[in-house]
């Protein structure tokens, strides 16, 4: 289960990354997601528990911003369901991995989003 502690750990990890590279980004923290907004695009981290309906959240984000990038952080990733629903995600992170692996994956996605090499 992706609990509140891990959600705030994710928020702190993202803010450290932004501070490290001195990026101009707005960070919005919602109950089950974190949104990073630049002048041209947005990146959404969806952090839901096993019983939540993440398809609904992804489609809600897509309705408001077709070009938004979305990363899903969930346990027990069902790639077939994600593929069949045509969710168009930038990435999926299995939160059952260690925090070090999750942090590495988050950093990789942020590098890609902000074009940092």
Predicted feature locations:
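Conserved phosphotransfer microenvironments
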Residues: 11, 39-70, 76-80
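Output/docking surface of receiver
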Residues: 75-79, 83-117
């Amino acid at each position: 289960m992706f609990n509140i502690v891990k959600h705030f750990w994710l928020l702190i990890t993202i803010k450290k990354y932004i501070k490290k590279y001195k990026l101009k980004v707005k960070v919005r923290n919602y109950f089950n997601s974190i949104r990073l907004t630049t002048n041209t695009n947005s990146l959404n981290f969806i952090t839901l528990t096993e019983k939540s309906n993440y398809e609904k959240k992804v489609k809600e984000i897509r309705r408001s911003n077709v070009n938004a990038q979305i990363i899903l952080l969930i346990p027990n990733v069902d790639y077939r369901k994600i593929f069949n629903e045509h969710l168009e995600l930038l990435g999926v992170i299995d939160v059952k991995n260690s925090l070090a692996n999750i942090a590495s994956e988050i950093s990789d996605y942020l590098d890609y989003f902000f074009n940092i090499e």
